[in-house]
Amino acid sequence: MEHIHIAIAANSNYIVPSTVLLQSIFEHNKENDICIYLLYLEGSLSEAETAGIARFTEGRGGRFRPLCIRPEQLADFPETRHGKAALLRLCLPAMLPEVDKILYLDGDIVVKDSLAELYATDLGDHYIAAGKDTCPVYHPERMPLLGIDREHWYFNSGVVLMNLKAFRGIDLPAIVSRYAAAHYDFIESPDQDALNFICAKRTVYLHPRYNMNYAVEKDVAAETWGADEVKAAKRNPAVIHYIGPVKPWSVRCTHPRRKDWWDCLERTPYAGYRAADDTAANRISTCMRIPLKAIENRFTLSGKRKLGKMLPGTLTRWVKKCLGK
């Protein structure tokens, strides 16, 4: 039996998504000993909410440990334009001295396969294992502004296997503080940007079946992960990460695997949950955008850019509006 340490972060707004995530973890990891660590800022969850997640976890055969982060524990970390809440996972090395590695999962995730192989990834002296992000393809100009080594492929921090033992060998708060001060105006994702800076040349890249953005063009996907790997990931995903501002619990979501989230929800105490934005207008809008999104995804990024130069500005803006951009 594989012992797997998993950290998640939540607040009162993420109780339902976190429960869906946990349900999916336990459904596909019955042969593994799972310990869930719940990261949350003091005051962001009620005692009843924390107890509810604990009961759910233990009822599925897992172990549970709450990790309440008090303001003084973040005192050594810098203020960012996004606040300190985005830096919670960086507290893990100091808070869990007895744990050498931990898998961190964002709340907008559904697990579809065992996590044992991912957790068994040989990190060596690397700080982290993570999946590649498309940012270097879409926004290559951001990398030097963020101080990211050009030989390092920027990763997405929604699914990361963290080498806590290696992280404890460096002064993480001090490094993050210096980084934030030097790149304050350009940081968009505080923990993700900082981790990419710190972990340059000490990152193990995961197969895209563990973390892949579905809403990208074919040429972007091929450049980021490789065409064969993308096909394999779509055919048999281990982790579905709903990257982007519109999540599957919104009726406006057009993600091709949004049904996986709702199916998993029905096997939780929140079965029958209705999206907060479930209105007739939003349903009609989504029904119109889904086929348009499918058509859009058939284009390559280079093809879109060429087409964009040919189309009148008003038509381009209308198409973007229809696609919800």
Regions found by a protein language model. Give the residues of each.
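Short, surface-exposed amphipathic charged segments that create phosphate/polyanion-binding patches used
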Residues: 76-86, 143-147, 220-225
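Short internal beta-strands
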Residues: 34-42, 130-131
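Active-site-proximal specificity loops/subdomain of glycosyltransferases
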Residues: 49-50, 55-95
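Short loop->beta transition adjacent to catalytic acidic/histidine clusters or analogous donor-positioning motifs
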Residues: 4, 29-37, 64
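A glycosyltransferase accessory/donor-loop signature
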Residues: 1-4, 10, 169-325
